[in-house]
Structure formats: C-alpha cells, structure tokens
Amino acid sequence: MDQRLSGYATRAVPRYTSYPTVPHFSPDIGPDDYATWLSALDPTDPLSLYLHVPFCKKVCWYCGCNMKLSARYQPIADYAATLRKEIGLVAGYLPTRMRVSHMHWGGGTPTSLSESDLGHAMEVIDHHFSFASDAELAIESDPRTLSGDMIKHLAGLGFNRASFGVQEFDPQVQLAINRVQPPDMVRASVDGLRAAGIANINFDLIYGLPHQTVGTLTRTIELCAAMRPNRIALFGYAHVPWMAKAQRMIDAAALPGAAERLAQAQAASEALVAMGYVAIGLDHFALPDDPLALAVRQGTLRRNFQGYTTDTATTLLGMGATSIGRTPHGYTQSIAETRAWTRAVEAGTLPIAKGCALTADDTLRGWVIEQLMCNGRVDLAAAAAQHKAPLGWYAEAEPDLAQMERDGLIYRDAAHRITMTKAGAPLVRTVAAVFDAYLRAKAAQHSVAV
C-alpha cells in the first residue's frame, strides 16, 4: 500500500453494520418506544428475524460476541423457554401475522439447543409469522459439536443456509485462539449438510490472528475453497481485550503488525478471487451464482448486523439477550444479561435496554454510508434529492474528502459523485466515517480500518 494510504489503515473506525452505530444507542429508548414502532409497521411489508442463542461449549479466545459457557443443559433449556415467550410477546405488538423473508439464528452456537427446543421455537415462529416461499433460513453452527442427527433436524425444519466459523486451519494459530478443528472435521459437516439438502454454506475467516502469516492464511483459503462454500466472509481480528474478556488470553506480542495485517488481507482477497469467488463489498466473497453475487450485479446489495446481505426488508426483529433490531423508526438492543432479560420477558415487558430513534439526518447519512460500503460509490446529489436535504449537507466532510482525493482513496466528479479507487477500496470504512456525525461529535473505540 502507498505510504500516503497506510496512515488511513490504522485509523479506528466502525464496521458500519448500522448507522448510527451501537456505541451511540441510548437508554432513553425503551420498551414503550419499541411497542409503538412495532404497531406502526406496514402490515404488507416483509420483515426479517434474528434470534440470538449465546451458549457455547468452549470459549474461543478471539471472540467478541455475547456468549455464555454452560456445562449443564438446564440453563440452555430455560433460555429457550424464555425465547419462545419473547417471540409471542413481540408478535403481539405487530399489526398482523407478518411475512418473513429472512431468518438468522446467531450466537454463541444456536445448535447448542436440543433438537426438541429448536423445534419448539420454530413452531412458535410458524404460529406468529408466515414465511415467504423463497425465504432464507440461516443458522450458525460449530463443526466441533454439530451431529448428524441435528443436521437432519435442521433440514426438516426448513433451514437452507448454514454458517461455520473456520477462522484459520493452521494448528499453531488454532491453539493460540483456543479453537482446534482440523479441515476434515469441517468437511464432514459440510458434506453432511449438503447431503441433507442444506446446500448453501457460509464460512467465516479471520486475518490478523496470533502467529498467523500470509502463508498460513493462504493455505487455509486453499483448503476452504476445496470445500466450495457458497460464501466466505473475511474479517480482520479486532483485539479489544478491555471489551472482550476472553481476548485477554491472547498473547498480544504474537499478533501481526499493521503491515502484516494488510498483506494478509490483500493476499487472502487475491487468492479467493483467483479461486473463482466474486469480491463482495469490503470483506465478503461469493460464488458467481450465489444470490449475494447477483445482488451486486443488480445493485441491491445491503449491509446489516450479519454483514453483507440480500435482505432488503426495512424491519429486522431481534430476539434473545443482546439482540439488535431495526424498524423504519429506529434501532433497539435487548438486555444483554440473560437473567435480567428473562425477568423482563417473564413480566410481559419488551426486553429493550437501549436504542436510537432515527432522525432525517440519520437516515440520509446511513444511506450514503451503506452505498459506499456496498457499492464503493455514492451520488451525493441524488442522496440530497432523495432525502430532501440541501446539496451542501455534507460541508463538514468536504476537507476530509478533498484530502482523500489528493491521497488517491477516491475519485470525485463535478456531479457530486464519489467512487472508491482500487487502491482505496480496502479503506472504504475510513471514507464512510467522514459522513458519520456521531463519530465527529464523540470519539469512540473501534477496530482499525484494515
């Protein structure tokens, strides 16, 4: 990377899976606001569901997710029972039995639920919602614990996409992050899912891990590509031990520096493209016939809390402790602590801890940021016209944009269009950040740009 650009790579900026971002959510938004927003939804619009199951059998030291260890099943069963109640509670505020276009189970490890508890949850969902004929039903799992019986059960419940956290296959790296899973173990799960009819497989990979090199990551990609997952997400490891306690187990001295991280990201991207994958936005890759690649060609790619998506629904209902949702009126996040979340649901209260009511300015800036993140370009004049804003609404960003143009991150034209350059594309988060009014007003802790 050009020396002019390298300074941008170490800037701490959000991943922009929402705007405003989660650090700017406020406890002033609560259950009453969410109830009002739910009842105001257009009953003819499709929506998406996200269900969070925080339980895992082992702690992966790189993980920054909200997760819990449980040696016994009873706490998981209790959680599943409360989740079923929350589904009914949320549905009770909707104007009708609404149609679902996407559903995603995340965690944690959602397949830590028993077949019975997962099945009962799906029965409750089916009672309160209908599914579009082409709905995507996705679930995250762990090849170290996924059984053949659970695979058959998932297929029977209608799931059509599964996601695995592969991260890295090098044994030394796996030991350093406390996630040991040989390639054959992952392949067995992939083969089992596809044999059962769940043909769509996602892998997550991470660069910037302890002891990781360009060589280990490239070899991991070769092994992954041989299994032909439909989608691969490639994330940079964010070392934030002050936020994610498990990361305190990672030897910070073994982490690659900024130049090595950048080399890993570039080598991985080039390897995936060479192996037939289409680059999607900042950090995703897909086979050419995958709906995500089609969305890029059609200009319909979106970005949400799961990353890049084909989901165009304007409402995402989050259920489960710490889950995040969105309606056209704003964002909400549920209570993170499971006992407090349980008490709220048992009391018949929507378990909202905080959120953000969207202003017209939020909607405008969020649209611009999403266009940059998804398409690598944005028409600022069109944004102003579409959102009924003056053309100079982004005046405070102009000095930064001018500098970024001089440094070769972006092209600009007289029609107020911005396009990422090839060299600047990996730094799109940094460009998006100049439109973030909250980031300008209040410094927040985020991961570095690459």
What are the residue ranges of the model-derived segments?
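C-terminal scaffold of the Radical SAM
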Residues: S39-P46, L69-Y93, R99-A389, A449
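Flexible, acidic/Gly-rich N-terminal and inter-domain linker regions that tether
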Residues: M1-S48
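Short amphipathic alpha-helical interaction segments
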Residues: P390-E405
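Local cysteine-cluster metal-coordination motifs and their immediate loop/turn environment
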Residues: L51-M67
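Minor-groove-contacting beta-hairpin "wing" of winged helix-turn-helix DNA-binding domains
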Residues: H416-T421
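Short alpha-helical scaffolding segments that buttress acidic/His motifs in well-ordered protein cores
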Residues: Y50, C63, W367-Q371, V431
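A short, conserved structural fragment
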Residues: E405-A415
